[in-house]
């Protein structure tokens, strides 16, 4: 068995089936192996960053890791995607091709080894594990340690640097007998015991106004339906953090929507004004998004806090916690469902969910289109199998406000690290993981200009994605903060760009909507497209400035 054979075996056992990136001679032997294995699909991206975001979207939608292959400068291009996966606890395998071991530190072209450019230090900062294979003697142990980290909790990216001359080298005979040890075994934390479940349910029974908040830390646990069933038994209102949106449906009678930035205020009102007397937080980091930039209101929080997170360092970091439970969201909800039933109580102060299309939708000037008009038109026309991916910028706020989550697991966004353009390629990864669903990505024109070339990837692989692009000719999130203090043109204006024409040039369908009277027909045509399609919507730049409620 060679090093390459062992690596492919570990990838297969870890459930990796999608490998994306750009071709590199440093990994040619490995790519040949993968191409000959029917269990792997190779996706040729147009940019290494796009490959990383595609793998990210696939993992979020499927719960399984994907692999990314890069080399040389491509390894620096993928860093933002790796950092994004790290912040959001998304499992991903990054394979970087290295020069031959004998060339380390000799100023060989594109030497990114620790003796060259030293990119390993950067990957170690963002990855759960980063290893560099430097000899046959330690190849197996280093590869195995990386895959153990890939399966560990909290989830996250791992990195393996593989010199091109070692891929085809045979492992020492004494290592072959242990090559299969531990393959595919996902290390999970032991479920919390009945004592913890009894304690939580006891506190719940004694509370008058409890609240459950679900964060991104439990997204990959797939507990949406289970936790809602428990909430129904107890009459327990629930919300998500901005980064956890999509775990549960927002149209449920017990839903309070989103707590913090981008929320409609119902969850914040219930927490602080009711006031809530028991806050159960699962997979929540209590960072700036959920606390509205660490609003002073949180210092006066009256609720008893139960914090569940597999990362012990997250418990009590900002919010005073009376009970910390270090376990996964899945283990926690399983323990609750195995415990004694909670006492049902109709809770106080729960306002009904906001309607999907708010009456009196604001209109832009003349025939210009307000972003909420687009959101409500999309929401009206979306099929039951639709999944929304929101990119970064003002578009994400309009998406939160205008399109409610109707089914769990049908909304994806990267709100925490927020790399612009991540949703463009991420939507392709989601569609690759869920071919039976219609994936719609909502993005701004600035982000689209960064990673819009990945449309070509969707065209090449026949992947159906619809991109709805808010085109206002500016970086709106940058223009808002400086307006009134300087001319925003130097830092925000990107000019008029025909993105529908760009889509057609890349082989996709492109639809341009300039006026309100064209909006409904344009949306209907875009959603009816059977392949990759870009809906390019002209948005009034003076209107595209949502209030996200920082510090309230």
Swiss-Prot record:
Cofactor(s) in the UniProt record: Mg(2+); thiamine diphosphate
Catalytic activity: 2 pyruvate + H(+) = (2S)-2-acetolactate + CO2
Pathway(s) annotated for this protein in UniProt: Amino-acid biosynthesis; L-isoleucine biosynthesis; L-isoleucine from 2-oxobutanoate: step 1/4; Amino-acid biosynthesis; L-valine biosynthesis; L-valine from pyruvate: step 1/4
Residues annotated to bind FAD: 262-285, 309-328
Residues holding Mg(2+): 445
Listed EC numbers: 2.2.1.6
PANTHER family attached to this UniProt entry: ACETOLACTATE SYNTHASE LARGE SUBUNIT ILVB2-RELATED, THIAMINE PYROPHOSPHATE ENZYMES
Protein name (record): Putative acetolactate synthase large subunit IlvB2
Gene it is expressed from: ilvB2
């Amino acid at each position: 068995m060679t090093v390459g054979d062992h690596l492919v075996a570990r990838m297969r056992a870890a459930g990796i089936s999608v490998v994306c990136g750009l071709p590199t001679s440093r990994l040619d032997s490995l790519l040949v192996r993968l191409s000959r294995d029917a269990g792997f699909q190779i996706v040729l991206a147009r940019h290494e960053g796009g490959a990383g975001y595609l793998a990210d979207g696939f993992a979020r939608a499927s719960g399984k890791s994907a692999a990314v292959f890069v080399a040389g400068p491509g390894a620096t291009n993928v860093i933002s995607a790796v950092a994004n996966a790290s912040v959001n606890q998304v499992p991903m395998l990054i394979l970087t091709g290295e020069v031959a071991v004998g060339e380390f530190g000799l100023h060989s072209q594109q030497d990114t080894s620790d003796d060259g450019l030293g990119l390993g230090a950067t990957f170690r900062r963002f990855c759960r594990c980063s290893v560099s294979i430097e000899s046959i003697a330690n190849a197996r142990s280093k590869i195995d340690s990386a895959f153990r980290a890939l399966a560990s909790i909290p989830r996250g990216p791992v990195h393996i640097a593989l010199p091109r001359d070692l891929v085809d080298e045979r492992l020492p005979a004494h290592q072959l007998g242990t090559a299969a040890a531990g393959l595919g075994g996902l290390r999970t934390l032991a479920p919390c015991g009945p004592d913890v479940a009894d304690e939580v349910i006891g506190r719940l029974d004694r509370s008058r106004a409890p609240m459950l908040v679900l964060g991104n830390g439990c997204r990959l646990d797939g507990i949406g339906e289970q936790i809602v069933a428990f909430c129904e038994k107890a009459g327990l209102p629930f919300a998500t953090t901005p980064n956890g949106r999509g775990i549960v449906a927002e149209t449920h009678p017990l839903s309070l929507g989103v707590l913090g930035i981008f929320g409609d205020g119902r969850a914040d009102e219930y927490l602080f004004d009711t006031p809530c007397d028991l806050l159960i937080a699962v997979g929540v980091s209590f960072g700036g998004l959920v606390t509205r930039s660490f609003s002073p209101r949180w210092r006066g929080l009256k609720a008893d806090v139960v914090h569940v997170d597999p990362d012990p360092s997250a418990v009590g970091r900002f919010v005073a916690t009376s009970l910390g439970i270090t376990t996964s969201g899945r283990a926690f909800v399983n323990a609750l469902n195995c415990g004694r039933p909670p006492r049902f109580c109709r809770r106080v102060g729960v306002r009904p969910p906001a309607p999907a299309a708010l009456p009196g939708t604001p209109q832009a000037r003349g025939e210009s289109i307000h972003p909420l008009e687009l959101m409500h038109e999309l929401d009206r026309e979306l099929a039951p199998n639709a999944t929304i991916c929101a990119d970064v910028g003002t578009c994400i706020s309009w998406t939160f406000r205008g399109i409610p989550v109707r089914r769990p697991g049908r909304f994806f966004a990267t709100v925490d690290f927020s790399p612009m353009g991540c949703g463009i390629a991420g939507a392709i990864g989601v569609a690759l993981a869920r071919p039976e669903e219609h994936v719609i990505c909502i993005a701004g024109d600035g982000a689209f200009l960064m990673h819009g070339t990945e449309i070509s990837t969707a065209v090449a692989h026949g992947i159906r994605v619809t991109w709805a692009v808010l085109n206002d000719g500016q970086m709106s999130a940058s223009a808002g903060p400086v307006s009134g203090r300087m001319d925003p043109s130097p830092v925000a204006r990107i000019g008029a760009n025909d993105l529908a024409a760009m889509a057609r040039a890349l082989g996709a369908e492109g639809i341009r909507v300039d006026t309100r009277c064209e909006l409904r027909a344009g949306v209907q045509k875009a959603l009816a497209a059977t392949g990759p399609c870009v809906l390019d919507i002209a948005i009034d730049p003076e209107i595209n400035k949502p209030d996200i409620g920082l510090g309230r």
